[in-house]
Amino acid sequence: MTNHCDTASLLLRGLAVAAPAALAVSSTSCSSQKNPGDNERKPLNIVYIMTDDHTAQMMSCYDTRYISTPNLDRIARDGVRFTNSFVANSLSGPSRACMLTGKHSHKNGFLSNEMSVFDGEQPTFPKYLQKAGYQTAIFGKWHLETLPTGFDRWEILPGQGDYYNPRFIRQEGDTVVEHGYLTSIITDKSLDWLENERDKSKPFALIIHHKAIHRDWIADTCDLDLFEDTDFPVPETFYDDYAGRPAAAAQEMSIDKDLDIIYDLKMLNDTVDTRLKSTYLSIIGRMDSAQRAAFDAHYQPIIDDFYKNKRTGKDLAEWKFQRYMRDYMKVVKSLDDNVGRVLDYLEEHDMLDNTLVVYTSDQGFYMGEHGWFDKRFMYEESMRTPLVMLLPKGLERRGDIPEMVQNIDYAPTFLELAGIEVPEDMQGMSLMPLLRDKKGPEKWRDNLYYHYHEYPAEHMVKRHYGVRDDRYKLMHFYNDIDQWELYDLKEDPNEMHNIYGKPGTEEITARMMQKLKAAQEQYDDPIREKYPIK
């Protein structure tokens, strides 16, 4: 498999696989579809790239303080950048189910990673596209417990997958091990399908789902030495004391207390044992001798320094933060390089004018804000997710799009782009009105609904739901706690001061309560029966 650091051309396999014949559907078929500008043209293709845990602040098109991501910036520069993009449930499997179905978790049935299994019989946007004559393919992370449906071609990772020499489950029914680094391998498979396996007379929807940048942030060998001389700025909320926020205080995702010194920070030592040490040994045990030699050569001096100098207190906490940031950024670098390979292929084959290219993440992530790693909470860093698009000809919008969008909007967007009638039970809104014209629509949604279900579980984030508008956010933590939180995002963008119940907030609280009630009714969330809002 090609390494992203290899400047040689990608050698694609000489395979040709014909796609199944298109199935009849009641909606507009791709053979008669009109383009977004209402002129007859070829059906539009879709390339949907999604990463895992890539937070918006770690893309230079959103924030220039941390890392340069030239290929992701290229999408934003030549296309559109959504500045208010959010998820409905900030967790990997549930987010993927929302994206596939266009429905909130309580409707698609996949509430949590630990307790849910995706019902593959339910409608998804790939199934609708497939029936309309599109070829559909997915390569990479799936993470929904059942095998993919609605795809003509798929190869997926078992569970989270491995960064080095990963296993892939193939639709032929077997499991294969591919040699190399996962992000490059997924890109290889995707480009191979574009070049050699698809029927080039038909439109396609290609889903490229990366494991990167998921914990435990293991870089490619060629990127190991990057960022070692960089000291990243410590977030101003790093030493948050969680005053007035008992649910935030109860989490187990602190960089200082909960990062595993071996599994996460890679400080392997024969005399030190941790909860996740055996898992880490299994992970690095997948490396071949050359990969392991490069890995050990990089980390051993850092390990020696760590156990020699025995940092404590603030010094240790900030050392962990810097190690976490550096490893995360190395994985981002590989990801950006591989996105560039996809963009280069599409450009070299004159496909960009007829292809919607989407880049996003399954959710945001904490990079030391509030002292945390991971996601789950409705707070901004994890509810927000990056979303940039390269638009085909006929879609006129460029630059920043400030309207609030959510990952349940992707499915109806893809269907409308393909000329397929959006089913009434999809809860998301098609983004096509935001993309067609230079100025966008006069009216759009004014709030978003969120519901996180996975508790008790890893990181111990309490169950909660809430509503966010353009200024305020109201949340209710429930189950073994009954805690309301209200934030003024204009005055308190870091969400440090819970103003729920404070004098002078009665009118704001009442207004947000009614928005929350309306959202729960609109999306038919049964939680409203257990915790009714008057």
Question: Where do the language-model regions lie?
Answer:
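Formylglycine-dependent sulfatase
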Residues: T2-N3, L10-A18, A22, T28-Y478, ...
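Residues forming the ATP-binding cleft of Hanks-type serine/threonine protein kinase domains
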Residues: K490
